[in-house]
Amino acid sequence: MDRIEGLGVTELIFITGHLKETVEAYAKDRYGYPCRFIEQKVQDGTAGAINLARPFIHGPVMIIYVDTVFEADLSLAETVDADGIIWAKEVEDYQRFGVVVTDADGFMTKIVEKPSTPVSKLANIGLYYIRDVQALWAGIDHVLAAPANKGEYYLTDAFQQMIEHKRRILAAEVGGWYDCGAPGTLLETNGILLAKGAARRRDFPGVVISDPVYIEDGVTIERSSIGPNVSIEAGTHISDSTIRNTIIGRDARIATSVLEGALLGNRVKVAGLRGDA
């Protein structure tokens, strides 16, 4: 979200669900834009989610899925000669993703979900710019009018409908893409971000800190070994523990434990644990 500055953004619209209050509080505190929050009460897919924002979108729109961290030049949206942009990243394990198939000029022709053969290695990362928003709504209407696929309607099907009606969507490759959609990839992404400069080290008497780490103010640690690749939020207390490659939320209590590859939420209490969590 920090990368949208300078793009002439007039409003941020968040489609929320689980932990909506946490999202709202964070967004209001973090971003200096007007924010609107819409709860998706029926989990009917990405097309259904974006359709909830329709009454409030009257011009070009940037759509960002929240389970990914990316490095991309979003200023391309201001100059591109196209009806939209779909950002993608070349991957070797293309079988795990929806991939973007393009023509010779780099414009999307279709998206293939989890192909068994390498029709493309450009993974769809969930970052889009749509200039022709009316064509987007027409595509979503078409998708929502058809039977749902296992209860969900997909935004990429709306893009396919746009292409079939002669709209041009450019596939642009990102410099970096870090997935946060599963515990393992979230921990991996956390380590990458720490190594790239997000680290924040604090030292404590009798505690060994192995960089990179991110430790907020208000954390207390005693007789422990922390890091590498550990993030700890404010209010957490740790004692007599060894913690590596782990993310810990606010106000947690951890004692006499060895943790590696763990995700601990806010106010979690752990004692005598060995392993991941």
Identify the residue ranges that each predicted region occupies:
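Conserved beta-strand segments of alpha/beta enzyme cores
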Residues: P34-R36, F107, R168-L170
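Short internal beta-strands
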Residues: I13-G17, A88, I247, L263
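Left-handed beta-helix
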Residues: H142-A277
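Conserved N-terminal catalytic core of the sugar/cofactor nucleotidyltransferase
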Residues: M1-Y65, L74-L76, R267, A271-G275
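Conserved core of the sugar-phosphate nucleotidyltransferase
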Residues: F70-A145
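Structural beta-sheet core signal
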Residues: I13-F14, I63, G84-W87, A171
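Active-site glycine-centered loops adjacent to acidic/histidine catalytic or metal-binding residues
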Residues: D67, E90, A182
